Amino acid sequence: MTLLSSLGRASRSAPLASKLLLLGTLSGGSIVAYADANEEANKKEEHKKKKVVVLGTGWAGISFLKDLDITSYDVQVVSPQNYFAFTPLLPSVTCGTVEARSIVESVRNITKKKNGEIELWEADCFKIDHVNQKVHCRPVFKDDPEASQEFSLGYDYLIVAVGAQVNTFGTPGVLENCHFLKEVEDAQRIRRGVIDCFEKAILPGLTEEQRRRKLHFVIVGGGPTGVEFAAELHDFIIEDITKIYPSVKELVKITLIQSGDHILNTFDERISSFAEQKFTRDGIDVQTGMRVMSVTDKDITVKVKSSGELVSIPHGLILWSTGVGTRPVISDFMEQVGQGGRRAVATNEWLQVTGCENVYAVGDCASIAQRKILGDIANIFKAADADNSGTLTMEELEGVVDDIIVRYPQVELYLKSKHMRHINDLLADSEGNARKEVDIEAFKLALSEADSQMKTLPATAQVAAQQGAYLAKCFNRMEQCKELPEGPKRFRTGGHHQFRPFQYKHFGQFAPLGGDQAAAELPGDWVSAGKSAQWLWYSVYASKQVSWRTRALVVSDWTRRYIFGRDSSRI
């Protein structure tokens, strides 16, 4: 008892280090050893985690964040919005078919993880400093001096997924007088603008000419966005608006202006033709072969390509949807890395920015610079020629065929275009007989046209989502694939690539055309148009929602619209 009392008094009066030493002595040093081991493990864990900064919360950024194993990374996200928007339904938001809140989901809800945390900063990145591995950001809260101070973030890996902005082609008056449809806020402004046009048109004191001008809705661009908005607007006016404003229903007009020869020119010709015929029946004026020269608050001037004639068209509201342009931060970054003058950042097939090994670019702000097989023919031939005989046997070729197909996907597309199954079919002689061996000239000749199948991927949500998911998979297997590379052979330097290159899989595309009709183009040359395609569109878009909450809200909005119609209130 005396010994214990003495130890107690000593413990109370001794410093912390002495207490640990005393306790460690009594317990054989196990506690001190545990403390040291625990501290060592924490340091090791912190050392392991690489800093990943993600710019943007669109399709590419969210797909990456959803699939990334963040136990291995310290993840920070910079985005001017704290939500993800299901952008394919933006045309539906413009007319109240779907409410804006129904297609957005908080990024913080999407990125909830059990074994880690993702930090989100609501800010704009205005400069990427790839030399010092930093991004410089500006908070979006400009009206609050305390919350608007610029800051910078360091990174080990940077994921650039900032998307693109509208391309005005330098046309005078577009920025000042046109609506765009890239964000949820754009859709809400258009919805208010449409209602405003009708409210103004029924005011007393206006001439019929003034009323017609205010009720003339012009869409510039015959791509999916422009066509879907035209269809939604037509349904909104016919099914709902004219019942509320019957006095001006005969004055309403919708015009779709397209510079090309046909609308929906990225779709199958059958769909393009069906869409034009349906719009004509619906009274939508489709004007093709016209180029917009300038826009004012009352008129839009277009040039007829066939005759060169300039035509002035009065308007009440214009939607400009003519493709995508480059954001200033991307233009500045491209100048830094020697890519000035491009529309999008050039990446390799692994989505790494050319010249920046630890910077990746995905989505609308990036474009894959596919490697041409003709530039590597000599290296491929040398790698396959195991006995250095100067000729390739079919057995030697078999050893590299899979690597060729993976590394150069244009070869597989070329084979399909020729209705062939195997590279050996390309190497057949002039009479179609299989060869036993080929020299380098015959090998080069057989693949000389393969690069003609190289195509730039479209700036769509489907492409961006697949790129984000692919990149997350690569990051999740980063350490594993350093030791055991899973990619194709490196024909120039030997060894194997760390990962398989990104390969886009096209699952088809839809074009809602109004009147409960849509057009669908699916793999395998499957084309459908009509009500069945519209119901397929409903099911696919409902299934692709990012959460059960948005899925339920979107389906509920569709049901509400069928029962009660669209709301025409201007809020």
Curated annotation (Swiss-Prot):
Optimum pH is 6.8-7.2 with NADPH as substrate and 6.8 with NADH as substrate. InterPro entries: EF-hand-dom_pair, EF_Hand_1_Ca_BS, EF_hand_dom, FAD/NAD-bd_sf, FAD/NAD-binding_dom, NDH-2, NDH2-like_C. Residues 1-35 form a transit peptide. It is an enzyme of class 1 (oxidoreductase). It comes from the Eukaryota. Its main location: mitochondrion. FAD binds at residues 51-81. NAD(+) binds at residues 215-251. Residues 372-407 form the EF-hand domain. One of its GO terms (molecular function) is NADPH dehydrogenase activity. Expressed in seedlings, roots, cotyledons, leaves, stems, buds and flowers. Binds 1 FAD per subunit. It catalyses: a quinone + NADH + H(+) = a quinol + NAD(+); a ubiquinone + NADH + H(+) = a ubiquinol + NAD(+). Its EC number is 1.6.5.9. It is found in: Mitochondrion inner membrane; Peroxisome. Its cofactor is FAD. It is a peripheral membrane protein. Activity is calcium-dependent with a more pronounced effect at higher pH. Belongs to the NADH dehydrogenase family. This is External alternative NAD(P)H-ubiquinone oxidoreductase B1, mitochondrial. The gene is NDB1.
